[in-house]
Structure formats: structure tokens, C-alpha cells
Amino acid sequence: MTKKQKKKLCQLQLNEIKTSDDPTKLSCSFVIFDFDVSHNNTVISKDVALEAASTIINKPIVAKYYEVDELNTSTDALGTHEAYLDTDKHGELEVKRDTAPIGVFTSEGYITEIETPDGKKEVLAADAILWSSRFKDACELLLEWYGRGININTSCEILYSNYTVQDGIEHLQSPIYFEGHAILNSEKRGEHDIVLPAYDSSKLLSFNELQRFERLVAQAATRQNNEEGEKMNKFRKVFELSHSDVRTLLYSQLDPTLDKESDSFIADVYDTYFIVNVYSWSDENSYDKYFKFNYTRTGDTVSIDFDSKTEVFMTRNWEEVVPEPIQSQLNQKDEQIKDLTKQVNQINKDKVGIEQQFNTASEKLVQLNSEVEQLKPYKEKHEKTLLEQKLSEKNEFYKAKFEALNAEEKFSTEEVQNLIHASVKQDEEGEKAVLQLNTMLVDLVSVPTETNTTIREFSSKRENLIPNDDSFESRFSQ
């Protein structure tokens, strides 16, 4: 029976972009990996890397480019591995990728040194060209990232058959073959998140993309095992170079418990348990199963509860294919949803502004109310002083009136004093009090009785009382 061939994803970094007089290409170089133990407890020695270095030349560099949402905006981005499960022309299941080749490696791998925070380190690197004239937008995006100092992440797949495990660390042996290289999205742009070779599910939503890629490869490998038989019995295992620390610790405890003719990859990690795909190619007991293990975490250490091992399976749903007219309507609805979402966001933004203004006004009102409460005693004192002043003026006014009428006793009565107090008020009661006081003063005025002194004299003669001549001359002439 032939040895099984395994596949692993390695992280690369775009190390350098060089200028060129040829406008059709963009020269660059990549750092593929170093020779230390990786985050998934795998190590490739310098000698093994040099033997495999010749297989990197002429291998494609691929990417999935997403155009800008609107012109002159920073919304374009790159994708992931864009893997999906499909069949080849013979009807056999395989993993395909929705990416396009945008360049090629032009050199074999070579050993070089790079500067790190811990000093110089030897790495395996390779030169490449990107076809800048044919993939202008994607190359411009890479140049933008490179110019801004953004770490450009890529990943490459390596195929290998031989390895040994020592102290939980997998040592890859020759032969190793480099297969393909994908440039990943390296910056949050629009709706596209950063895609890294390693994912922490509590921080990055895009973890699901690479996890889906792993499952697709595992499904293809499983069916390939079932269909090809022992002579062509092959499988694929795809996992990242840079797992999170928790995942790495889980691998370090789990892998030493597996048989030599079995392997695993951790599909999901949660706070208290994880799901692992374990597959064995043993002649006596070959299988491909998923298991759930509970684990606990204390600081930088984890402890797997192997007694909690439970076989699990993943479910899926069959969905109806949406016809193109309906899909077009759905796309229109999606655009409407985006527009409405923008409007809602703007409304929420305006709402926040109004709430801030309201809060400011409320704080000002509270401050003013506080100041009013502080000034209230002064106001009451001032009003009391004015009232006493008006009362004193009214009292002096009516006292003089009553004294002029020789009615001091009347002035001193409770009735008059109450009316004087009421006359100070600026309301109907005050007006009535003033009217009663004035009426009272009028009633106190006494008018003396006049004696008739008319003198009447009678004429002794009653003749010639009317002149005979009534002319003008007789009446007015001398």
C-alpha cells in the first residue's frame, strides 16, 4: 500500500517589491518560513527545506480580487483561499478554488537572513513576479499595502509523505513539494475582514472561511479514500501554520495519544470543549470520524478530559436553487437593505447628536434650577421688603386721610387695618379693599346745613313796570 500524502498550509510574507522598467510585471520576493517549531508543532529542517526549494519555481501565485463598492474609495480587497467542493470532469470529488493566478515564482527557494525583533534569522525565501498590467487593481492594492507598511499575508500548500513525531512535534521529512500560493486580504476594507493563516474564533469572524476550507478538503479526502481503494488510498489534511495558543496546546496533548497511522485536525474550539477530526489509515481499523472532547484552561495551560470523548457528526441542509429572476430581485432587495441601513445609521447618528444636545440642555436646566434654588431666599427677602414698603406707604396714606376727617379711632380699627393690608395686593381682592376704604372715607365726610337768607322786597307801585317804547334807541341810547 502506498504511503499517504499529506497537505499543509504554510504562511508566507511579501518581503520586498522591486521597481522594474517593464510595465507588465512587478518583481517581488516572499519569505516562506523559518526553521523553528511552528505554532502547530511542526518543524521543517533547513536541509529538508533546501531539498524542496527547487519545487517552488514556476508555481502560481493566486488571489481573489474584490472591486471597489464605489469609485475612488478604499473598499476593494482580496479574499481567502475561496475553496469549495466540486467534481472534476470524471465526476470525482475534489477541492476547487475561485481564485485567479496573478503571478508566478521565478526562482527556486533560497536561504537568506531577515531582521526580527530578536535579531537576524535564517529563512527560506523565493523571488516572484506579479503581472501588474493584466491585474492592475490587485497589484495597486498590494503596492498600497506595501507602501503603508502593512504586513501582506500569503499562504502556500506543501505536499509531503514522510514525517516523524518526537515529543508531540511533527518533523517533516523529504520529499516535500510546494504546490500553490495565495495572497490573502491583509487589511479591513469595506465589508472584507483581514484574513490570516491563523484565526482566533473569539476575535475574527473570518475564521469560518478557513475552517470551511479545512472541512471541504477533509470531505474530499474522505470520499477519495472510499472510492479509490487501497492502491490509491490518499488523504489530505489542511491546517494553518499559526494556530492560536489554545489550539496549539490542545494539539500538543492530543497528538501523542494517537496511533502512528492516524492523524487529526481541530475543527472548532470553544470555551469548554473542542471538535477534532481524527482519521486513521490502519489496515485493521481505518476510519474518519469527528469527536468532542471537554477541556479546561488555567492560565497558559490546558487539560483535556479524555474520558469525555464523544463521537459527533456535522449536519447540513439541502436548499432550493434560486432562479435568476428571483436572484436578481434578491440582489435588488439587498441593495435596498444597504441603502436603508445607511439611512438608519445616519438617523442613529443624528439621534445621538440630538441626545447629546438634549443632555447638554438638561444639564443646563438642572444647573439653572440649582441656581434658582440658591437665589430663592434672596427673592423672598426682596419681595418681603417691597411688601413692607408698600404696606407702609398705604398705611401712611390712609392714616393721613382718616386724620384729616378726625377719624383716628376708625383708622385704628381691625376692619380698616385688614383693608389696608389687602389693598397692597395686585388682584381683585386688592381692588375691592381700595374701593371699600375710599367709600369709607367718603362716608366720613360731613356737609354743613345752609340757612336760607333770601331777602324779598315788594314794590309799592306796580304801574309802568314795562316801558312803553320798545325800540332799539329807547333801550340802548343814553
From Swiss-Prot:
Keywords: Coiled coil. Residues 326-419 form a coiled coil. This is SPbeta prophage-derived uncharacterized protein YonD. It comes from Bacillus subtilis (strain 168). The lineage of its organism: Bacteria, Bacillati, Bacillota, Bacilli, Bacillales. The gene is yonD.
